[in-house]
């Protein structure tokens, strides 16, 4: 009880000292119990915006008209995301705004003196980390309590609705509350700052030697490039960036140390970083030129720009202010995520790459439209290996960026884009003569791409049995059809037994499904031709008069001398309707 009373008293003090921040916490967490699955994108807005509300109040603390500005800002961004076209959790502007607030929040109050700036940042990050850890511990305790109650009293508490909402409430309520408690204590003991010896040990004897070793490795790699006169690998960007980030981090943390080592190295670190930065940008350029711009690579460019500016600022005493680093990072994030978006930038770049590939493949007609020659059944078999690789690139581009680009759809047509999207697998990989020996296809009973109404007439059956199990066409250790079995292909009988039923079905049923669709199971077809058979193939009648309902079913086009065709490999049975 003393703990509860102490926490209640502490909560009362927080409400008096931070009334608006606590109000936002109460309001946002009050929405959590009412979140519904079907309207989660709307119901979660106030909850997901809590970090922004909370940080805004603390950033404006002790400013004139702080409460009014914070409330107005909160209402404005809430309405903006409520009426936005994309759900808040899928909106680049939300994540960009969240990152900007995070940077400003942990670097508050943007102290001009670098040592104080680093101290404030480390202190806030430590407070935030401890608050999250404590809230996480409460989450674990809550789950243990709910589990105990459920086990002892046979009360179903651990439902998929209760537990997630409970944990979300705990994290959203206790994390900011614990942070405010730490903030109170820090304000009361500011003059007594002292950092543990462990930080000095980590910076002086672990991180700094790693940075120096990385510097040596990077310069050796640079010497290798110059010696062999070759371009750096595209992946070098993912090596250089952590190295420079760690170096900048150590350079800042050294300001907090009483006995900082490696002073000479860090005095010239900014100048030593110039060559790695050049490698970084060459690597990024190589990566983008080869694979195109994606959302991740847009953010890679943003991060590389930040680090480049930070290094340049570090070269002059006047600009080497960490608050300037913080504001620069916020500006770049604002430009890349709110004024525009990584997806939009990637989409525009990939459209240019798409059109360049179309020209290189020579499939544009005189009107600069996609030529009808791609629909020729023999077209794919005439392609060179270099052209095949370019069609593979088209496959990757179209699905992620082109089919959702209204400019591309208006210019080239949805039908041709859809056809090109599946061209690599359907027409090249699947239909090439080199694949006749082994071509697999999976039929899915429930496919969102099909518009048909999936219904089953259950009148002829008495009971439904849940199976949920995978069965294959033979011995699981014998994946290939044995030579002695080839004479009976398409005439086999499969006997299945479980603890409730015994049932069997004939392979000849699949032959009849093909025939009913005007197809020959012994001939090879494109996937687009075969996939409409999925509904009939996954509803298999048994000899006992029942019906097996498959979730998915695998076939492979096999060739055994004169005997060839789509051979049943196995499938996942969900239900059995017994007569």
Curated annotation (Swiss-Prot):
It is found in: Cell membrane. The chain crosses the membrane at residues 13-35, 39-61, 66-83, 93-110, 130-152, 162-181, 201-223, 238-257, 264-286, 296-315, 324-346. It holds the Pfam family DUF4153. Keywords: Cell membrane, Membrane, Transmembrane, Transmembrane helix. InterPro entries: DUF4153. It is a multi-pass membrane protein. Disulfide bonds: none annotated. One of its GO terms (cellular component) is plasma membrane. This is Uncharacterized protein PM1469. It comes from Pasteurella multocida (strain Pm70). The lineage of its organism: Bacteria, Pseudomonadati, Pseudomonadota, Gammaproteobacteria, Pasteurellales.
């Amino acid at each position: 009880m003393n703990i509860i009373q102490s926490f209640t008293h502490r909560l009362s003090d927080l409400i008096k000292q931070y009334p608006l921040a606590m109000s936002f916490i109460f309001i946002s967490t009050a929405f959590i119990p009412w979140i519904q699955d079907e309207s989660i994108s709307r119901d979660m807005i106030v909850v997901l915006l809590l970090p922004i509300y909370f940080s805004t109040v603390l950033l404006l603390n002790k400013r004139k008209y702080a409460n009014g500005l914070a409330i107005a800002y909160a209402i404005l961004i809430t309405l903006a995301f409520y009426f936005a076209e994309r759900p808040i959790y899928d909106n680049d502007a939300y994540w960009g705004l969240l990152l900007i607030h995070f940077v400003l929040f942990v670097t508050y109050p943007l102290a001009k003196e670098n040592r104080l700036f680093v101290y404030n940042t480390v202190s806030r990050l430590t407070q935030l980390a401890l608050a999250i850890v404590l809230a996480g511990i409460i989450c674990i305790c809550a789950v243990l309590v709910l589990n105990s109650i459920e086990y002892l009293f046979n009360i179903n508490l651990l439902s998929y609705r209760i537990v997630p909402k409970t944990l979300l409430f705990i994290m959203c309520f206790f994390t900011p509350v614990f942070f405010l408690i730490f903030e109170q204590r820090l304000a009361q003991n500011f003059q007594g700052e002292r950092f543990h010896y462990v930080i000095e040990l980590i910076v002086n004897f672990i991180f700094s030697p790693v940075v120096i070793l990385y510097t040596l490795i990077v310069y050796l790699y640079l010497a290798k490039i110059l010696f062999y006169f070759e371009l750096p690998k595209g992946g070098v960007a993912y090596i250089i960036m952590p190295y420079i980030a760690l170096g900048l981090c150590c350079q800042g943390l050294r300001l907090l140390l009483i006995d900082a080592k490696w002073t000479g190295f860090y005095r010239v670190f900014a100048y030593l970083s110039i060559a790695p930065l050049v490698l970084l940008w060459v690597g990024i350029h190589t990566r983008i030129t080869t694979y195109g711009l994606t959302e991740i690579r847009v953010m890679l460019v943003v991060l590389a720009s930040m680090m480049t500016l930070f290094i340049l600022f570090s070269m002059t005493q006047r600009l080497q202010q960490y608050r300037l680093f913080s504001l620069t990072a916020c500006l770049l994030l604002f430009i890349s995520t709110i004024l525009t978006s990584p997806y939009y930038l990637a989409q525009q770049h990939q459209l240019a790459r798409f059109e360049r590939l179309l020209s290189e493949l020579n499939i544009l007609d005189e009107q600069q439209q996609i030529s009808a020659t791609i629909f020729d059944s023999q077209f794919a078999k005439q392609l060179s290996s270099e052209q095949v690789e370019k069609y593979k690139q088209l496959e990757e581009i179209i699905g992620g960026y082109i089919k959702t680009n209204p400019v591309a759809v208006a210019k080239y047509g949805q039908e041709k884009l859809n056809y090109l999207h599946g061209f690599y697998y359907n027409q090249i990989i699947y239909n090439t003569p080199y694949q006749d020996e082994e071509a697999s296809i999976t039929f899915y009973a429930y496919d969102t791409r099909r518009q048909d109404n999936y219904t089953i007439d259950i009148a002829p059956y008495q009971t439904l049995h849940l199976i949920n199990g995978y069965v294959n066409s033979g011995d699981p250790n014998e994946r290939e059809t044995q030579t002695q079995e080839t004479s009976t292909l398409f005439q086999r009988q499969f006997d299945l037994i479980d603890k409730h039923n015994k049932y069997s079905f004939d392979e000849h049923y699949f032959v009849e499904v093909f025939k009913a669709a005007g197809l020959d199971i012994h001939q090879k077809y494109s996937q687009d031709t075969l996939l409409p058979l999925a509904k009939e193939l996954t509803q298999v009648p048994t000899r006992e008069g029942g019906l097996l309902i498959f979730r998915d079913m695998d076939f492979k086009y096999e060739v055994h001398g004169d005997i060839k065709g789509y051979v049943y490999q196995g499938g996942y049975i969900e239900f059995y309707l017994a007569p």
